[in-house]
């Protein structure tokens, strides 16, 4: 062949590879309401920045006639590109080719991208839409999953890993997303489960459809497996871009600085009255969080799961911060098993990637009851104090109202390593509430006597000043000054240099 023929051959092969399973399969994918792998990548990345790797890789399976079913790329599109000018690596299962099933060869494509991301200190994004393991390959496909899981684990805490479930994700395929830092799902399109509805019916005789078993709502509100539930694929991909704007590319960098035009001295007068005078009345903690952040913008994570704790990202004077807060508007803000898990994992993520932690505390205690005790609230609650105590990033705590007992301790208290502890004048820092304490200490007293003692207890302990006298509270502040006080504390601790004793790893109470 001459040069022109060689070039023409390449162009034809390249065009064919770009079609994945072919025009018919692409039309079928569109008819199901889903984009193709390449369309997803093009929407996710900066325009024209995608560089595809291993486009002509193909499987080597000869079982069950597979040697006659060769599709270039082998149902996987992988490579690298940029998001907001920053390097990222990405791989997307191509459902138009072999149903996006995982083979030995396309698993190797994923592992190559994972290793490149790790070497170059860049995030890796997985776009999942797969029928699962390629049955025709048997154990070779399973070994491919194992290699991916291994790379997920090695990269954990070194580079951000993000997964989007944009179709089916069943069986062993579920474990890679769960080993990553954040999972996105699409309403009524994404499904994750270890065993599908048919197997569930056979084994347990339960009648359940795939949406109830493993849909986006189930995993965002009940299991806590997924972090974000989006309405469309487009919203999902844009949300991934937004999430990355708060994160560094790796654990050796800081998150990108965003120039701030929002006055750091801005007072928020509404905070003077947002907390009810009755200490037992609820309020929405986000009415405190949002107004004090840059441009009053809060990017919430896991908004539908364990609503008694609020987590997410924001910025203070241009710097990314992780927010952890008790939510008095839900279960009075008590800590339970799910809330403990939710908070602890987020705290550890922020610590991995040098993101300072701001804690808004209003917690009356841990949720009582046999269900919580029997399911291990002691063990789960300990995860929060472990995560906070282990974290070496700047840690700033603001007590807005209640801070009682063991729950006060675990929510980034001064003795567990917080750098700056602030409190509002109405903060109550005590072993427990006045009524509970008096009922224990003076159980034989009359109701009238108890009321007098309750008033005495409240005057002595239902305020922040006893803790401030002992240095457990660094400063009592007016609510309106919250934004500037947080910015000041963050700037003071910006160059914090702390390291824990050398160890292989700790033994967190999992």
Protein language model regions, located:
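Ligand-binding clefts of soluble mixed alpha/beta catalytic domains
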Residues: 1-510
């Amino acid at each position: 062949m001459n040069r022109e023929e060689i070039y023409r051959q390449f162009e034809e092969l390249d065009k064919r590879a770009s079609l994945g399973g072919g025009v018919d399969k692409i039309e079928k994918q569109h008819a199901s309401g889903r984009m193709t792998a390449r369309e997803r990548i093009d929407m996710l990345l900066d325009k024209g920045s995608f560089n595809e790797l291993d486009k002509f890789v193909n499987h080597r399976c000869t079982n069950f006639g597979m040697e006659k079913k060769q599709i270039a790329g082998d149902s996987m599109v992988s490579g690298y590109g940029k998001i907001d000018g920053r390097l990222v690596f990405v791989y997307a299962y191509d459902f138009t080719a072999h149903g996006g099933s995982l083979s030995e060869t396309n698993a190797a494509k994923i592992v190559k991208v994972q290793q490149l991301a790790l070497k170059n200190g860049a995030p890796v994004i997985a776009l999942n839409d797969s029928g699962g393991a390629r049955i025709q390959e048997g154990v070779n496909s399973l070994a491919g999953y194992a290699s991916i899981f291994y790379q997920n684990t090695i990269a954990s805490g070194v580079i951000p890993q993000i997964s989007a479930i944009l179709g089916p994700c069943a069986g062993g395929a579920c474990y890679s997303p769960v080993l990553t830092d954040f999972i996105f799902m699409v309403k009524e399109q994404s499904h994750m489960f270890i065993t599908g509805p048919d197997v569930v019916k056979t084994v347990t005789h339960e009648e359940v459809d795939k949406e109830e078993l493993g849909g986006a709502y189930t995993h965002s509100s009940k299991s806590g497996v997924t972090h974000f539930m989006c309405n469309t694929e487009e919203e999902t991909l844009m949300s991934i871009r937004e999430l990355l704007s708060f994160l560094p590319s790796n654990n050796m960098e800081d998150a990108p600085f965003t120039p701030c035009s929002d006055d750091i001295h801005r007072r928020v007068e509404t905070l003077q009255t947002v907390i009810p005078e009755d200490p037992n009345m609820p309020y929405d903690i986000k009415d405190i969080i949002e107004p004090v952040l840059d441009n009053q913008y809060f990017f919430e994570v896991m908004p539908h799961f364990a609503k008694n704790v609020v987590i997410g990202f924001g910025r203070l004077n241009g710097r990314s911060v992780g927010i952890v807060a008790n939510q008095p508007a839900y279960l009075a803000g008590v800590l339970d098993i799910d809330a403990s898990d939710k908070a602890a994992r987020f705290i550890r993520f922020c610590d991995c990637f040098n993101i300072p932690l701001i804690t808004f505390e209003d917690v009356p205690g841990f949720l009582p009851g046999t269900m919580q005790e029997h399911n291990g609230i002691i063990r789960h609650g300990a995860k929060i104090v472990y995560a906070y105590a282990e974290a070496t990033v700047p840690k700033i705590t603001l007590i807005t109202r209640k801070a009682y007992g063991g729950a006060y301790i675990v929510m980034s208290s001064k003795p567990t390593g917080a750098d700056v502890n602030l409190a509002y004048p109405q903060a109550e820092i005590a072993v427990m509430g006045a009524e509970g304490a008096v009922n224990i200490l003076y159980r034989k007293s009359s109701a009238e006597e108890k009321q007098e003692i309750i008033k005495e207890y409240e005057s002595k302990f239902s305020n922040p000043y006893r803790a401030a006298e002992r240095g457990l509270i660094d400063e009592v502040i007016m609510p309106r000054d919250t934004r500037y006080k947080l910015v000041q504390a963050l700037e003071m601790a910006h160059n914090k240099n702390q390291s824990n004793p050398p160890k292989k790893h700790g033994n967190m109470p999992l």
